[in-house]
Amino acid sequence: MARNTLSSRFRRVDIDEFDENKFVDEHEEAAAAAGEPGPDPCEVDGLLRQGDMLRAFHAALRNSPINTKNQAVKERAQGVVLKVLTNFKSSEIEQAVQSLDRNGIDLLMKYIYKGFEKPTENSSAVLLQWHEKALAVGGLGSIIRVLTARKTV
């Protein structure tokens, strides 16, 4: 048995700092300090005003907030992507989809299904056109990967 059992020197941990209501994830703090993830709305708007739809499309899909838990960031990114998708002409959709790799098509499908969850006026018809073209390029595997993915946009 230890000689000094009445000593309280071993109690150096402050258990009040580990209160679950005060818990702050360091990963989220680092992401907030490094800048918000997601597409840059100013860059995308500038490209849309110039009429460069393909570059606006790629800029909207770049830096997607997949790993963040912040719903406001995800909603803002969804709005930017939906704005780009609705500005495309139906004849240009196929070219834009074919410019993506497999991961890009999966990301596009995630945004399409997220748009189906919260439809706005005329967005469903546009999203169905995008879905048709993305399905033709990505196949059924892209739908399965999106529906079974744990990380959402």
Swiss-Prot record:
<protein>
    <recommendedName>
        <fullName>Actin-related protein 2/3 complex subunit 5-like protein</fullName>
    </recommendedName>
</protein>
<dbReference type="GO" id="GO:0034314">
    <property type="term" value="P:Arp2/3 complex-mediated actin nucleation"/>
</dbReference>
<dbReference type="InterPro" id="IPR036743">
    <property type="entry name" value="ARPC5_sf"/>
</dbReference>
<dbReference type="Pfam" id="PF04699">
    <property type="entry name" value="P16-Arc"/>
</dbReference>
<comment type="subunit">
    <text>May be a component of the Arp2/3 complex in which it may replace ARPC5.</text>
</comment>
<keyword id="KW-0206">Cytoskeleton</keyword>
<feature type="modified residue" description="Phosphoserine">
    <location>
        <position position="64"/>
    </location>
</feature>
<comment type="similarity">
    <text>Belongs to the ARPC5 family.</text>
</comment>
<keyword id="KW-0963">Cytoplasm</keyword>
<dbReference type="InterPro" id="IPR006789">
    <property type="entry name" value="ARPC5"/>
</dbReference>
<comment type="function">
    <text>May function as component of the Arp2/3 complex which is involved in regulation of actin polymerization and together with an activating nucleation-promoting factor (NPF) mediates the formation of branched actin networks.</text>
</comment>
<dbReference type="GO" id="GO:0003779">
    <property type="term" value="F:actin binding"/>
</dbReference>
<keyword id="KW-0009">Actin-binding</keyword>
<dbReference type="GO" id="GO:0030833">
    <property type="term" value="P:regulation of actin filament polymerization"/>
</dbReference>
<dbReference type="GO" id="GO:0045202">
    <property type="term" value="C:synapse"/>
</dbReference>
<dbReference type="GO" id="GO:0005737">
    <property type="term" value="C:cytoplasm"/>
</dbReference>
<dbReference type="GO" id="GO:0005885">
    <property type="term" value="C:Arp2/3 protein complex"/>
</dbReference>
<keyword id="KW-0597">Phosphoprotein</keyword>
<dbReference type="GO" id="GO:0098978">
    <property type="term" value="C:glutamatergic synapse"/>
</dbReference>
